[in-house]
Amino acid sequence: MAGKHGRNGFEDDDVNPFAGGSVPPANNSRLPPLSHEPADFYNVDIPLDSSKDLKKKEKELQAMEAELNKRERELKRKEEAAAQAGIVIEDKNWPPFFPLIHHNISNEIPIHLQRMQYLAFSSFLGLAACLFWNIIATTTAWVKGEGVIIWLLAIIYFISGVPGAYVLWYRPLYNAMRTESALKFGWFFLFYLIHIIFCVWAAVAPPFPFKGKSLAGILPAIDVIGRSAIVGIFYFVGFGLFCLESLLSIGVIQQVYMYFRGSGKAAEMKREAARGALSSAF
């Protein structure tokens, strides 16, 4: 079979595929190394102040400090001058939720006078509470047919009585306690007596000179309770509040007067009054 066909098809031929030279042998050479170059970093030049610049800035800081010290001394001088003239710069801090007035008993009133001042402050708040309840009582009476006039008068009592009490007797007492001014004590006594008279009058509430039921006192309470028990109860509560306010106010004026006499302020007030009369005469 082998002789007939001449060669065996399964016989390996000893053939070199690269013998013809058509495919070049692999080159074993390396790539050339990269040249060494210096890293190109950014250079940041931070200039250092010279001694001349430092001295200049130091002089500027010293000038600013001197100016601030000058302003501080000027402000202190104005505050001292205002204090000597009786002018007090006050920040509004009361009531806390809506400041309307300056009020700081613990820091501005001497310790031995703070109790009296707190009692007077309670009297002021008590008057506000009485007049506010008086509005409620007259409102119930108005609803039950007593007329709108008494309600309008109750509103007038409140919006005039509370600020009036603060200006006429509470603030003078506050300043008197703080500055030990005898004349301010005299002003307080005058208008606080009027306050006590009004509280006693309101507790009774006669039909004159005010409109009969515009004050929640004992007489209107007796009059209306027969027609309306609810209105009568509101008026009796108002009567009780005015009685408590009257008693508290009497206690306040007694304590303030005892301090006024014991501290020699009465004689001082007489001397100041006499001095004022002489100066006005001449």
UniProtKB/Swiss-Prot annotation:
Main location: membrane
InterPro entries the record matches: SCAMP
Cytoplasmic side stretches: 1-117, 251-282
Bilayer topology term: Multi-pass membrane protein
GO aspect biological process, one term: protein transport
Segments traversing the membrane: 118-138, 148-168, 185-205, 230-250
UniProt-annotated location(s): Cell membrane; Cytoplasmic vesicle, Secretory vesicle membrane
Coiled coil ranges: 48-92
Cellular component terms (Gene Ontology): plasma membrane; recycling endosome membrane; trans-Golgi network membrane; transport vesicle membrane
Keyword Coiled coil in annotation: yes
Start and end residues of each stretch annotated as Disordered: 1-36
Keywords from the UniProt entry: Cell membrane, Coiled coil, Cytoplasmic vesicle, Membrane, Transmembrane, Transmembrane helix, Transport
Pfam families: SCAMP
Stated family: Belongs to the SCAMP family.
Function: Probably involved in membrane trafficking.
The protein's name in its UniProt record: Secretory carrier-associated membrane protein 3
